[in-house]
């Protein structure tokens, strides 16, 4: 492993470089370091790690390193099983897909290796013959063992690793079951029976593990319905594969698992699942040789199909009932002594085994042949079955006709076997056995002895050995008294009168009792006859006893009637109370469980969120630390690479451990390198000096001493070789002489047999030549016939190919035309979409231009309002001088510059004259100019009060207010208050331009006329407001107000806690208002007249009204409109100022 940590991107690039130069093992090691180093593995996202993982698994598959792939998969699961389950699923599925593709390629390669034979005429080469003789395998088996089996083993290990990886993870539960089904398909495809057994055991162990209680919230819980359904589907697939592979023990275990899962589930399984379960269970019982439970399973399947399946045809019902009936009739007759099995040492008794099998079928007790026949009759199966099977039931279970029994049953069996695809063929042997046992029982009731040949003629489908075995089995299992006399060729029945055959009544048709049965029941019959005689002699005795007993019972009933009735009622009440209590307890328990589940889910969610937050923080911290560490290690790596370039540096790095290198810095390593280089130089010098002394003396002396020894050894070797050759030559000559003599003797013996050999050779040659000629003639005829047949097939095949080619061309032409039409439609739709998009773009451009013009106009308005405000501030001193010169005017009331009326004159004017105030002011342009100039100026303590919004005394903000009209008397006038209290007594006091602001609720409290002693500041005049502090808000402009609501509702304002109304309080539900004071739409505001702001008439500054520039048409006079009529919204927007100088301003949101 490398000493240095690389970034994942660099590791992937490095691995690709190794792959390009043909070193996949080095590439795998490079990628493996990414998952081994855990410092920063959890800091990277799946977008970085997932490509590395795919390349890592690809290399593992290529090199068949399943254990290395397992290590990487476990690390990847720990990283992303909580963050991105989809990435983990993609990685595992990709890994298994790669392994399956490689295995299929190996299988094709193995098959191709057999076809790639050089000489087809000489298939059996000497090598193949020797290999088949040694190992007992053919060429295909050997090819599979060398090419296919390694990949099959790798794929099997991959499936097992993935199942172990995902066995307890609830997030990957679907993937776990998909892999299990893929493993079943793998075992079925490659016929791996041993692996299938191991897989079943592994899945069963996993199911046991998840059935245990676990405290981890991410684990799989068997109590969830989804988990139960997934396991049930997997076990059904397992059962199907086991049946196809004929592993009946594994199929039975799978059935037990399926039954356990269905029992564990709270809801009833689907009928389709139950039908499949009973069908497979019946097949397993039949393969196990248990015909009784096989018939019971078919009966349960019939009941389920009839009750649950809709639109069942009559043919299907007849087929199912016939199957049930014939399976029930094929059950062997029960043994008279089943307790014999208890003498056999087994783990469980037959009764326990039968009870266990009955539980799999949902039965309370094990079935029997008699009970199944009764159930068949009760469910009307006999009447719904085919007629021939109804007759079969009548012949076997009802009628007593031993002479024609086998012949009748033989006809039904021949009818069944005539159809090769009939599902009833498997029952023929069992029906023959049952028929023969019935025949033996019926013959035993008719004959005491019968000739064996006569008995064999009655059994149409049995031979002598088979019939003798049936007789022996009847004696063993059914406790019949049968003796076979082989000397006289006869059979005797019921010869021992002292032994009875069975105590219970035998099933099936009977004619009379056996002699031994009559002897056994003699005392019982005597007792019955004596009781009848006593009843005949004294018939009243029993009647009197019955009457006395009846009276006693009536008396007891009358005495205990009320008590028993009350006891029954109390019992019923207790039962009802108990039911209600149980229901209430169950309901409370369910609610408690639901609350606990919700609380657990909430806690789990919170814990998961906290965990994710902690992981993110930890990941960020580690990432920061890793970046710093990587910078340090990169510098260290550069230094070490420089040191590696020298031989001394390489030796130094080999001597130092990895841990020591991590603790050292670059300077220390350089010092170590210099020290090591100095040591090597000294050692090299010393070595040269010592070698210089040894070479001249030791080598020359050694060579001089060994020269005579070598010469002596060569002389001795020459003498020994000569003696050995002489001995071998003498022995060879002797053996050749002996072989010559033996060959001459053999030649003399064989010369006497030469004539006989020639005769035998000529005879054998003639016989073989004739046989060869006959075989050659037959072969040539067959060859000619096969040639004609293949030529005819080739003609038909070519004709069909031409026809299919014509059909394909026709279909392609049709598809081409449809494709052209589709493209044409798409082109038209695209042109239409582009046209609509262009129209929308042009419309949007128009709207944008309009909005820009409107925005420019609003900016112009704001600029003009600001200039007007500056002009008002400049004229404020002159207005104060004119007000002082004009008199008090009511103590602080606001007046226009053109208002010259005296205060006394204003006070003397009656307040009921307020309706005519507007008509009196209209001819005075100077007064109107002064009023309009003063309109935006009212403030209270530095806070702008919107003119004409609320009037004092109109109720609390947000309350329902009556609509304001011109004919309603102002509240202040009705109460006798002065106009000074309402905020001014100038010429604009009684103009009905909208709701008035609430004045008098400021910091000073309500101010009354003549209350000068309570206010030290004196009378308030225009411009005498106190200086503004930093926290005070300046007067608000009209364009500073927010959007108005739809429907004309007024704005809601919050004036900074100075007593004003909040934005959410100022509702106005008064409805439409007339003339200038009426409400406009939600986006239309009223603007005061702007001409002659500096005291002039309509002449001086009238050009500054931009609304007048847009509309040259004069406003419609008030007299020409009806009273209370409000101009339409469109007319107001385009008409300009009205007769009072007010203008509708459109507010854009």
Curated annotation (Swiss-Prot):
Record localization: Cytoplasm
Subunit-structure text: Component of the eukaryotic translation initiation factor 3 (eIF-3) complex.
GO biological process terms on file: formation of cytoplasmic translation initiation complex; translation reinitiation
Low complexity: bias regions: 925-937
Pfam families on file: eIF3a_PCI_TPR-like (PF22591), PCI (PF01399)
Protein name: Eukaryotic translation initiation factor 3 subunit A
Protein family according to the UniProt entry: Belongs to the eIF-3 subunit A family.
PANTHER family assigned: EUKARYOTIC TRANSLATION INITIATION FACTOR 3 SUBUNIT A, EUKARYOTIC TRANSLATION INITIATION FACTOR 3, THETA SUBUNIT
Keywords: Cytoplasm, Initiation factor, Protein biosynthesis, RNA-binding
Natural source organism: Culex quinquefasciatus
The keyword RNA-binding belongs to this UniProt entry's keyword annotation: yes
Keyword Nucleotide-binding: no
HAMAP family linked: eIF3a (MF_03000)
Highest classification ranks of the organism: Eukaryota, Metazoa, Ecdysozoa, Arthropoda, Hexapoda
Biased composition (Gly residues): 886-895
SMART domains noted in UniProt: PINT
Protein origin, superkingdom: Eukaryota
């Amino acid at each position: 492993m490398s000493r240095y940590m690389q970034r994942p991107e660099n590791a992937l690039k490095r691995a690709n470089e190794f792959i390009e130069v043909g070193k996949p093992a080095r590439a795998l090691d490079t990628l493996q370091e990414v998952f081994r180093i855990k410092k920063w593995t959890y800091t990277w996202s799946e977008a970085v790690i997932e490509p590395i993982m795919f390349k890592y698994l690809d290399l593992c598959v290529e090199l068949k390193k399943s254990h290395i792939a397992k290590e990487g998969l476990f690390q990847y699961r720990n990283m992303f099983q909580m963050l991105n389950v989809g990435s983990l699923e993609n990685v595992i599925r990709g890994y298994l897909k790669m392994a399956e593709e490689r295995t299929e390629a190996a299988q094709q390669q193995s098959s191709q290796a057999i076809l790639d034979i050089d000489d087809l005429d000489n298939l059996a080469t000497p090598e193949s013959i020797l290999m088949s003789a040694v190992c007992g395998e053919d060429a295909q088996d050997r090819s599979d063992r060398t090419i296919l089996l390694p990949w099959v083993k790798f794929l099997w290990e991959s499936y097992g690793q993935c199942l172990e990886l995902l066995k307890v993870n609830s997030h990957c539960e679907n993937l776990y079951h998909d892999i299990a089904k893929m493993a079943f398909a793998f075992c079925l495809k490659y016929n791996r029976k041993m692996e299938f057994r191991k897989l079943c055991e592994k899945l069963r162990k996993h199911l046991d593990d998840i059935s245990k209680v676990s405290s981890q919230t991410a684990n799989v819980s068997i109590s969830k319905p989804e988990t139960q359904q997934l396991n049930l589907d997997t076990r059904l697939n397992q059962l199907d594969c086991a049946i196809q592979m004929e592993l009946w023990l594994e199929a039975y275990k799978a059935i037990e698992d399926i039954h356990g899962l269905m029992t564990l589930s709270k809801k009833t399984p689907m009928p389709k699942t139950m039908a499949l379960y009973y069908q497979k269970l019946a097949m397993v019982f039949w393969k196990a040789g248990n015909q009784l439970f096989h018939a019971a399973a078919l009966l349960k399947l019939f009941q389920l199909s009839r009750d649950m399946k809709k639109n069942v045809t009559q043919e299907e019902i007849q087929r199912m009932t016939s199957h049930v009936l014939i399976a029930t009739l094929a059950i062997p007759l029960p043994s008279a002594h089943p307790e014999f099995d208890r003498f056999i040492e087994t783990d469980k008794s037959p009764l326990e085994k039968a009870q266990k099998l009955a539980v799999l079928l949902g039965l309370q007790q094990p079935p029997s042949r008699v009970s199944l026949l009764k159930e068949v009759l009760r469910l009307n199966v006999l009447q719904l079955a085919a007629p021939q099977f109804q007759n079969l039931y009548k012949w076997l279970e009802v009628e007593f006709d031993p002479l024609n029994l086998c012949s009748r049953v033989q006809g039904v069996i021949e009818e069944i076997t005539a159809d090769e695809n009939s599902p009833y063929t498997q029952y023929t042997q069992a029906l023959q056995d049952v028929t023969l046992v019935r025949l033996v029982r019926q013959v035993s009731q008719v004959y005491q002895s019968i000739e064996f040949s006569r008995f064999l003629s009655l059994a149409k489908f049995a031979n002598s050995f088979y019939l003798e075995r049936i007789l022996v089995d009847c004696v063993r299992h059914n406790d019949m008294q049968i003796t076979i006399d082989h000397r006289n060729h006869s059979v005797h029945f019921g010869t021992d009168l002292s032994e009875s055959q069975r105590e219970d009544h035998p099933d099936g048709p009977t004619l009379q009792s056996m002699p031994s049965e009559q002897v056994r029941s003699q005392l019982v019959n005597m007792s019955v006859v004596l009781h009848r005689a006593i009843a005949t002699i004294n018939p009243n005795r029993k009647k009197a006893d019955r009457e006395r007993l009846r009276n006693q019972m009536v008396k007891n009933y009358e005495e205990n009637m009320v008590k028993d009735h009350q006891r029954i009622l109390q019992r019923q009440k207790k039962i009802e109370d108990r039911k209600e209590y149980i229901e209430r307890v169950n309901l409370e328990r369910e609610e408690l469980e639901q609350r606990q589940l919700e609380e657990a889910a909430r806690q789990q969610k919170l814990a998961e969120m906290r965990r994710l937050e902690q992981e993110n923080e930890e990941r960020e911290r580690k990432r920061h630390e890793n970046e710093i560490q990587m910078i340090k290690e990169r510098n260290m790596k550069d230094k070490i690479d420089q040191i590696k370039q020298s031989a001394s540096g390489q030796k130094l790095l080999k001597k130092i451990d990895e841990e020591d290198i991590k603790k050292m810095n670059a300077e220390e390593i350089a010092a170590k390198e210099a020290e090591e280089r100095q040591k090597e130089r000294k050692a090299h010098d010393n070595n040269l000096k010592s070698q210089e002394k040894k070479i001249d003396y030791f080598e020359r002396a050694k060579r001089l001493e060994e020269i005579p020894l070598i010469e002596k050894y060569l002389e001795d070797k020459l003498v020994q070789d000569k003696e050995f050759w002489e001995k071998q030559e003498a022995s060879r000559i002797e053996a050749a002489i002996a072989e010559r003599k033996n060959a001459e003797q053999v030649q003399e013996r064989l010369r006497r047999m030469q004539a006989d050999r020639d005769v035998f050779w000529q005879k054998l040659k003639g016989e073989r030549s004739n046989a060869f000629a006959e075989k050659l003639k037959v072969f040539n005829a067959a060859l000619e016939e096969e040639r004609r047949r293949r030529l005819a097939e080739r003609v038909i095949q070519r004709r069909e190919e031409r026809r299919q080619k014509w059909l394909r061309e026709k279909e392609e032409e049709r598809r081409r035309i449809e494709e052209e039409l589709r493209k044409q439609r798409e082109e038209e739709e695209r042109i239409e979409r582009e046209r609509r998009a262009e129209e929308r773009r042009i419309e949007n451009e128009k709207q944008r231009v309009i909005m820009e013009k409107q925005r420019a106009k609003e900016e112009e308005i704001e600029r003009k309002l600001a200039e007007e405000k500056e002009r008002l501030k400049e004229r404020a001193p002159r207005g104060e001088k004119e007000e002082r010169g004009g008199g008090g005017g009511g103590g602080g009331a606001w007046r226009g510059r053109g208002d010259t009326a005296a205060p006394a004159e204003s006070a003397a004017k009656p307040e009921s004259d307020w309706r005519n105030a507007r008509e009196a002011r209209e001819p005075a342009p100077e007064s109107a100019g002064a009023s309009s100039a003063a309109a935006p100026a009212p403030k209270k303590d530095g806070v702008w009060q919107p003119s004409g919004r609320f009037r004092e005394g109109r109720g609390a903000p947000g309350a329902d207010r009556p609509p304001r009209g011109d004919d309603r008397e102002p509240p202040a006038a009705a109460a006798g208050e002065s106009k000074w209290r309402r905020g001014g007594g100038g010429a604009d006091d009684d103009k009905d331009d909208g709701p008035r602001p609430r004045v008098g609720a400021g910091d000073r409290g309500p101010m009354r006329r003549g209350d000068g002693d309570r206010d030290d500041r004196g009378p308030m005049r225009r411009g005498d407001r106190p200086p503004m502090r930093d926290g005070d808000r300046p007067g608000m402009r009209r364009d500073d107000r927010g959007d108005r609501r739809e429907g004309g509702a007024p704005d809601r304002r919050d004036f900074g806690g100075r007593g004003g109304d909040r934005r959410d309080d100022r509702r106005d539900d008064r409805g439409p208002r007339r003339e200038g004071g009426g409400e406009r739409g939600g986006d239309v505001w009223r603007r005061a007249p702007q001409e002659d702001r500096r005291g002039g008439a309509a002449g001086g500054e009238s050009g500054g009204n931009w609304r007048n520039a847009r509309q040259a048409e004069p406003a419609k006079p008030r007299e020409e409109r009806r009273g209370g009529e409000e101009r339409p919204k469109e007319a107001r927007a385009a008409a300009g100022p009205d007769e009072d100088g007010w203008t509708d301003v459109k507010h854009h949101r």
